[in-house]
């Protein structure tokens, strides 16, 4: 009886997940029952308690909680009370040590700009889209990590129950490199790091709509970090690179660079020749 009960608890628990913000991947997925979201206010790390700091704290065991510990002059924060809850630590003292406030708005052609409450995030973003051959631009601005957590929560729910299609609205940016990858190695200018990536795509038809040819679209994802509302003015004229160039750059980072290797090879060959002849 006991083993059957434990098995039931296991199968029920694997059906749920705790979604957290991740400073490199934008989002991560932990366990809903014993999973924690983590943030280190000194290092700027956000993750799903990858090093098991939170889960190892005796005072947190079997509790829903949110708070910070002082460890080695650093505030280390844990929460498991909501998806993406480690975003809430950005505004905890010291405020904005990592992360900033982002503009949160929607600009649709021929409509009034819709301004929403600013949000806190490790990365701010803007997405610009328009028909490839020209035309008015639609702009969405907001918090990138928060948006990616919401995207994957929605998609997971839709995959299971076919009742939530909100993820389709953010499918394009979810398939792009993360803001951490886009901004890596970019210089700071006046305290802000920023970069835009250009891409193209075919606009999908609405449900039930038939089209002869999909509409060719162009898009631009701009990421920034370092100053409040740094995403407020990102537009087509800003500096940017193509998605192809960005992906090539990301792949190049994975190749270890060892400038001593060619020298070592030459010395090895020379030494071999010396041994043969002498």
UniProtKB/Swiss-Prot annotation:
UniProt KW Transmembrane helix keyword: yes
Annotated localization: Cell membrane
Keyword terms of this UniProt record: Cell membrane, Glycoprotein, Membrane, Signal, Transmembrane, Transmembrane helix
Keyword 4Fe-4S in annotation: no
Cellular component, GO annotation: plasma membrane
Cytoplasmic face residues: 272-278
Signal peptide extent: 1-17
Membrane topology: Single-pass type I membrane protein
GO biological process entries: positive regulation of detection of mechanical stimulus involved in sensory perception of touch
Topology Extracellular: residue spans: 18-254
Protein name from the UniProt record: Protein mtd-1
Originating species: Caenorhabditis elegans
Gene: mtd-1
